Amino acid sequence: MEKFAFVHPLVVDDFARKFPIMRYLPDSWIEGAMKHVKSFKISHITGVRSPYAEAEGWFIACPLTARQMVTLPEEYVTGKIIEACQLAQDLGAKIVGLGAFTSIVGDAGITIAKNVDIAVTSGNSYTVATALQGTREAVRLMGKDLATA
């Protein structure tokens, strides 16, 4: 079975849903508290099947908001993302995807990848691949030859 994980930042409302008393606190206070929380597993994803393989994975919270990821010191944020990726590794993931702002901090995941023993992807390759596929399909629909278009 293939195993994966996806790391994503949180929003203040995520904490307020988990701890309803926090709804009455200013966002800045909640963000201050979030900085001291360790990365944690949000959910375990099962039942991913195709005719060729089966997979399971984990959705892991990097307990910083997108705003914190761009305003806190880069080394601190990178450390929190590495912590989340190490949790993915400990859970058994063989690849981890960096979601949202986790993929743009620093050097687009290169430092992250050097600090864990599993594959790390930012999704950029997937974005490029789908753009190329869309371009090929558009050229085909227009009745053109890509080599001469």
What are these regions (language model features)?
Residues 118-137:
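A glycine-rich, Thr/Ser-enriched phosphate-binding loop motif common to dinucleotide/cofactor-binding enzymes
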Residues 137-149:
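Glycine-rich phosphate/diphosphate-binding loop of Rossmann-like nucleotide-binding domains
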Residues 111-117, 139:
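Short, surface-exposed basic-aromatic patches at helix termini and helix-loop junctions that form
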